[in-house]
């Protein structure tokens, strides 16, 4: 019964440190394996139009980071796969579940991407299960990520259908308004939902949404995530594809949700909004800081690698993280 499960979110949790066993935090290994590939960090910039484009994807792949290209320039996906493969890089794309996507997947047999993410708002559905099965039939070597979901039942069903990883999170993102528009979602209890889902998972889980600080990455891993998808922390960089806007002499970048009218091009079934974020500088600086902070987290966990984070104790202290602290 769900009412017996503790409900909390990232800001309510503090991890308890263990004895440090490394002489320098730089010795901590932040790498993670997904499928047959190892990546530098367990983070994924959200597959959103204002977060990633082909140039950002190529940069991430070249530097050893995982990425997922968004699905909103559909006709560009196949040429994108070829360009990445021609450069010796992995291809990681997104698909939806509409009828024409089946033909698209079949057309990839001659040059299959290493990763495909089935990307819809409510991933616990027959349409997603059928698409998983289709991809696995047509492209058996491709690693399939499916989502988004928010319950153990959903995780089990998608895994049983053939998904290699599931994406957990319904509406906790900064530009997602699903819980306001529909009354449903994991907003406000995303970390507890992750914990709940991970107990049922036999394959990797990707935590998606609700990440506001670098410490939230460590918390996600503690509660069962293999990787963490992040939107707002990756938005607003100089390289970000979001439109540059100047307000009162200050530069901002647009950041909007994948289910917003700005992405959809129409005001229909809108579950996202648009905000302006101050320009943050270069993406590589954020990635470096993220890695350094995660190395510090590993040192506090008393280990040398990410797995040590899974075994630390924690306390639930409501909203304690912001008591007198600012970043």
UniProtKB/Swiss-Prot annotation:
The active site is at 176 (thioimidate intermediate). One of its GO terms (cellular component) is GMP reductase complex. It comes from Streptococcus agalactiae serotype III (strain NEM316). HAMAP family: GMP_reduct_type2 (MF_01511). One of its GO terms (molecular function) is GMP reductase activity. Belongs to the IMPDH/GMPR family. GuaC type 2 subfamily. Catalyzes the irreversible NADPH-dependent deamination of GMP to IMP. It functions in the conversion of nucleobase, nucleoside and nucleotide derivatives of G to A nucleotides, and in maintaining the intracellular balance of A and G nucleotides. SMART domains: IMPDH. One of its GO terms (biological process) is purine nucleotide metabolic process. It holds the Pfam family IMPDH. It catalyses: IMP + NH4(+) + NADP(+) = GMP + NADPH + 2 H(+). It is an enzyme of class 1 (oxidoreductase). NADP(+) binds at residues 205-228. This is GMP reductase. Keywords: NADP, Oxidoreductase. Its EC number is 1.7.1.7.
